[in-house]
Amino acid sequence: MKRVLIPGVILCGADVAQAVDDKNMYMHFFEEMMVYAPVPVPVNGNTHYTSESIERLPTGNGNISDLLRTNPAVRMDSTQSTSLNQGDIRPEKISIHGASPYQNAYLIDGISATNNLNPANESDASSATNISGMSQGYYLDVSLLDNVTLYDSFVPVEFGRFNGGGIDAKIKRFNADDSKVKLGYRTTRSDWLTSHIDENNKSAFNQDSSGSTYYSPDFKKNFYTLSFNQELADNFGVTAGLSRRQSDITRADYVSNDGIVAGRAQYKNVIDTALSKFTWFASDRFTHDLTLKYTGSSRDYNTSTFPQSDREMGNKSYGLAWDMDTQLAWAKLRTTVGWDHISDYTRHDHDIWYTELSCTYGDITGRCPRGGLGHISQAVDNYTFKTRLDWQKFAVGNVSHQPYFGAEYIYSDAWTERHNQSESYVINAAGKKTNHTIYLKGKGRLGIDNYTLYMADRISWRNVSLMPGVRYDYDNYLSNHNISPRFMTEWDIFANQTSMITAGYNRYYGGNILDMGLRDIRNSWTESVSGNKTLTRYQDLKTPYNDELAMGLQQKIGKNVIARANYVYREAHDQISKSSRTDSATKTTITEYNNDGKTKTHSFSLSFELAEPLHIRQVDINPQIVFSYIKSKGNLSLNNGYEESNTGDNQVVYNGNLVSYDSVPVADFNNPLKISLNMDFTHQPSGLVWANTLAWQEARKARIMLGKTNAQYISEYSDYKQYVDEKLDSSLTWDTRLSWTPQFLQQQNLTISADILNVLDSKTAVDTTNTGVATYASGRTFWLDVSMKF
């Protein structure tokens, strides 16, 4: 499989995917380097996944997170996808170079697709105020995309409002030479996998839940896709892609306090995707794109210990964008106008939630909570205008320049709404209501203006090139003026691309979290007989930012081996966390957000791959080995993010020693050393492709907070929070994918694929509790995939 890896001195200052689509727009100082690699790896800060890469990789549920799982700059939270919850199909969180998983920039065709409403709240619990969110605004099906580019370091100035990195997904553009329809079907089910469950978890697993944590012992996943590319007139055409990903999960309908299961029901987890792009090549000077996009996610739940607690939680996002490329005599101008609606919601079947202290439900007696808490949602409408001007390359003496300038304005209309009145109360033994709370119907909004200006120049002299740039951001939410310097230099030592060194310094300011402003609006609709109130303070926050020092090396070894080494050092400053206190006089709970969070991260990767595949008896063999190491220290939990409340602790007890909290290794997304061997075998005459990944992960640690009943608890340090690390063993996993495209069916182009994940059925612990209950990664899993082009 051919991979095109383009030198980063140009691409660090340009949109990589567009540079691939339109090479005339972005001029390259050096010739492109052609390599063959099973899995894309970072090249000077960016990793480009073509549609061919996406087809090759076993992408599991088909989300962008699944695609990036093997990237050496990325770490996943290993507790998200385990043997307990394999029926879930939602995107997983990712951390890039140790940064917050809620501070990545997601884009579609260069327009923001980030959900910054309340991405740290992924709880599926039933409550009057809980609206589950996620940082990916659109739950895209990667099989419908043209390409995806991850910017993890040396990120160009046109990308902002992130701390970790940028992920830009490109929708396919009409191609008159490729008028095809593609149908696809992909499936797996619980009968096709092995689940590794701790003995102490088996009862809850078989009952399908533990409190507000949901398990999936019995599920079926069925994914359907349809895409086409059609010419409508001369120089005018359309592409479209539709998909439905559905997981049907059988869970307990009700479980009594004694653990008695009273029937089971089927619950659906669905993600729908619709993408379309109309393209008009109006002339040699003008090209227009009109893009339509939609994703809708819904998840059915009940709380198995609450009768009548059925609810639907989900996300709906849709938008449109118009792009116009104009070729001027001396420059290229791109203008983009877009609108995106991103929303999260919780809709209960009932509007009243109450608890009877003594009740009977069917054959079950005891304490009975039941009901629901109505319909609540929050959303943001983003109206975007952006423009960018790329000058043609010109020379001043022996130095060439290619500057570009850009501006962007986004108006964000954020709102939260309770669609109907609901209430909660307790019925005591005397049959009277107590603890009565009313949640009033209401709607409130925030309007935010976001302004951006940026400029950069590509400067080249002989075999040295520089990319200085600067970005300015301002918004009236936190009212901070943020200036981000970006700089990169590349040296082609022998001027023949056999030895190249890249280095740079960059600053990345993060995005806003809108829920901090919406929370008081939502809480104002609550009337409690106790008179309790809540107040949120966030207005004096600084914008969190990351400073980056990075270096990259590329070396050609002999005639056919390419080695790449990358080092990234990140310091995260002014990270948001919170503290809470209660004013007893006014019965007000005050939540105050602060900038006390900080982390330091060292990230290193090394890869070896071939410039040309090995040819043995009509078989192309593409080997690749990748080493990656990421280690972070800091005073906040990446999973908790801006809801972290421990950053005010100057000292803690860690593994028996009283230490500074910010010297403690970060516990989540903690998979420091990973080594993977990727090997593809392609037999062109038969149409067989066998792709393999053998991955080893070093032993790592799970963080446990000690209580007074734990043996390791030190009573003389009772004034401090105490933590201990428990070792989790190293792991070796083998994932394989076998695809067959029968050569005798050229007209239909049928492809049948089978994925086997964790072929060795390794039992890998990913977490443990202070009582010693372990959680394990999924065991061996089979997927079947069939597609046809015609």
Task: Identify the role of each PLM range.
Residues S123, S298, N476, F494-P544, ...:
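Surface-exposed extracellular loop regions of Gram-negative outer-membrane beta-barrel proteins
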Residues S460-S465, Y567-I576, D583-K708:
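Gram-negative outer-membrane beta-barrel transporters
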Residues M1, L5-G60, S65-P72, M134, ...:
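N-terminal Sec signal peptide and the immediately downstream disordered periplasmic leader
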Residues N116, G687, A695-I714, S731-T733, ...:
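C-terminal beta-signal and adjacent terminal beta-strands/loops
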Residues D22, V39-P156, G166, K170-K172, ...:
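Periplasmic N-terminal accessory/gating domains of Gram-negative outer-membrane beta-barrel systems
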